[in-house]
Each structure stands twice: as C-alpha cells, then as structure tokens.
UniProtKB/Swiss-Prot annotation:
<keyword id="KW-1090">Inhibition of host innate immune response by virus</keyword>
<keyword id="KW-1114">Inhibition of host interferon signaling pathway by virus</keyword>
<dbReference type="GO" id="GO:0039576">
    <property type="term" value="P:symbiont-mediated suppression of host JAK-STAT cascade via inhibition of JAK1 activity"/>
</dbReference>
<dbReference type="Pfam" id="PF07447">
    <property type="entry name" value="Matrix_Filo"/>
</dbReference>
<dbReference type="InterPro" id="IPR008986">
    <property type="entry name" value="EV_matrix"/>
</dbReference>
<dbReference type="GO" id="GO:0052170">
    <property type="term" value="P:symbiont-mediated suppression of host innate immune response"/>
</dbReference>
<keyword id="KW-0922">Interferon antiviral system evasion</keyword>
<keyword id="KW-0899">Viral immunoevasion</keyword>
<keyword id="KW-0468">Viral matrix protein</keyword>
<feature type="short sequence motif" description="PPXY motif">
    <location>
        <begin position="16"/>
        <end position="19"/>
    </location>
</feature>
<dbReference type="InterPro" id="IPR043079">
    <property type="entry name" value="EV_matrix_protein_N"/>
</dbReference>
<dbReference type="GO" id="GO:0039502">
    <property type="term" value="P:symbiont-mediated suppression of host type I interferon-mediated signaling pathway"/>
</dbReference>
<dbReference type="GO" id="GO:0055036">
    <property type="term" value="C:virion membrane"/>
</dbReference>
<dbReference type="GO" id="GO:0044185">
    <property type="term" value="C:host cell late endosome membrane"/>
</dbReference>
<keyword id="KW-1039">Host endosome</keyword>
<keyword id="KW-1187">Viral budding via the host ESCRT complexes</keyword>
<dbReference type="GO" id="GO:0039660">
    <property type="term" value="F:structural constituent of virion"/>
</dbReference>
Length: 303
C-alpha cells in the first residue's frame, strides 16, 4: 500500500533509529565505542580519477570487513566476512577523488548494539565529518547495519564482541545504462517515487511513471505512488555479476520515463535502477512493498 508523502514518513529514512542516537555531524570518540584501535582500510575497485570530471558517472561505495566474533561461553570465530554498503554517489553530488581520500584516510572500529529488539552492527569512522556529504559515513561518522543482513546468519543471538581485523574499501563504477536523477533533481527539492524494502534501509528511488500509465489506474489523482504501487509485481531484482552488494531492477520501458535521468539513450532499452544492499538481499519481487516519496540526495531536508 502506498503511504503519504508527509514530513514524518520521509524523516524516518533520514534519521532511522540506529543513527538518531548520536545526531548528524557528531563523531563519537573511540574510547566511547570500543577498546580496540581503529583500522585503516585498503582499496580495491574501479577507480579512474578521470571520471571525477564526468558529471554523469556514478560509483557505489562498500566496506568489506573481516571480523573476529567472540560471545560469552563460546569460542571465538575468526575471519567472518561482512559487507557494509555505504551508498551510491554521482559526481554531481561530490568530487570522487575527495570522497575516496576521506574514506581511505579514516580509521574505523566496529561495535554492536540492540535497538527495539533488533541487533545492529555499527561501523564508526574516527575523523572529521563532512556535513553536506551524500554518504552517511562521511557526513555523520557512523553507520549502522542490520546484523543478520551483513554477517552470516549461523551465529547465536547472544551479545557479541567484534574485533575488526581487515577492512577494504571497494569502489564500483555503475554501468552506463544506470538511471540516476539528473543534476537539477539532485540539488533541487523534487521528491521521487521509491520502494521501501526495510525500515532501516534507505528506499530505492525510481524514475517517474509516464503520464500515460496514470490513466491505467482507477484514481489517477493519487499520482506516482498509486502508479508505482500498481506495477510493483512487474519489478524483479537481479544481482549484478562480479559486483559486491550491487543489485539492479530493469523497469518496463513503456511505463517509466528516463528523460530526467542520466541514462545514455540506447533505442528502446528499459531504464535500469542500481542500488546497494547486503549480499544476502532476497531476489524476490517487490509486490506488497511499501511505496513512499523520497529525495535522491539524502542530505536534503523535507519541508
């Protein structure tokens, strides 16, 4: 069912519970988070600094961590992988080289906390925050992930102690067929239809449904939310081969508009939306998911 686009509906995605405890731009000292020393990441990925001068280029940023997990009365499990998606960003939003430099020069720790019975893994960046940066990690200094979505599920539900032993920053260039809102949409105040897949994951922003599609529904006055809700059953998720934590949705070409996006026009090809999610994100459809309105740039504030 589609939700309203009021302030409270959108603000739950700007400030979900895992982040609200510390507030924006407040970096927490290491001694308040963990006894361990921070670790500096290595780098892998599709980094071509010439791309930072091309406005229509987007990159996905992921931290790939190796952690040791210790629990009370259980032996330590070493070498557990974790995939921690940081977000997708275009050069319209922030220079690529500056983002990579800030991520690589930061020192990181990892901790666990529980909120309303849900267990989270929090990655903490120890360094100076960048208040207007599109990536939450650089904007706020910490980012929380649902535990059972970022580490293997075959561990008990007891309280764990995490020891971060290795960290890699993965920068992945999105393919040329990627749809992203255009520059004026990113820096303006236009909201887009989006699919919510979990209360603590950001909604997946979609292109606007073509006006012709509105007329196929009983009440076209409800606009893009109703139009998207009526065709969720047609959307399918695919894992992008050889990419970490990157997924895509191919949209029906006859129902979605790509005019406002950065996609290169290739005949009648369908627009493709890329998004980040944990590696074990379910590849089923979006039917019965909640539809909301959201900004493409999470640094914008609802008014």
């Amino acid at each position: 069912m589609a939700s309203s686009s009021n302030y409270n509906t959108y603000m739950q995605y700007l400030n979900p519970p895992p982040y609200a405890d510390h507030g924006a731009n407040q970096l927490i000292p290491a001694d308040q988070l963990s006894n361990q020393q921070g670790i500096t990441p290595n780098y892998v990925g599709d980094l071509n600094l010439d791309d930072q001068f091309k406005g229509n280029v987007c990159h996905a940023f992921t931290l790939e961590a190796i952690i040791d997990i210790s629990a009370y009365n259980e032996r330590t499990v070493k070498g557990v992988p974790a995939w921690l998606p940081l977000g997708i960003m275009s050069n319209f939003e922030y220079p690529l080289a500056h983002t990579v430099a800030a991520l690589l020069t930061g020192s990181y720790t990892i901790t666990q906390f529980t909120h309303n019975g849900q267990k989270f893994v929090r990655v903490n960046r120890l360094g100076t925050g960048i208040p207007a940066h599109p990536l939450r990690m650089l904007r706020e200094g910490n980012q929380a992930f649902i535990q059972n979505m970022v580490i293997p599920r075959n561990f008990s539900t007891n309280q764990f102690t995490y020891n971060l032993t290795n960290l890699v920053l993965s920068v992945q260039k999105l393919p040329d067929d990627a749809w992203r809102p255009s520059k004026d949409k990113l820096i303006g105040n236009t909201m887009h239809p989006a699919v919510s897949v979990h209360p603590n994951l950001p909604p997946i922003v979609l292109p606007t449904v073509k006006k012709q599609a509105y007329r196929q529904h009983k009440n076209p006055n409800n606009g893009p939310l109703l139009a998207i809700s009526g065709i969720l059953h047609q959307l399918r998720v695919e894992k992008v081969p050889e990419k970490t934590s990157l997924f895509r949705i191919s949209l029906p070409a006859d129902m979605f508009s790509v005019k406002e996006g950065m996609m290169k026009k290739r005949g009648e090809n369908s627009p493709v939306v890329y998004f980040q999610a944990p590696e074990n994100f379910p590849l089923n459809g979006f039917n019965n998911r909640q539809v909301v309105l959201a900004y493409a740039n999470p640094t914008l504030s609802a008014v």
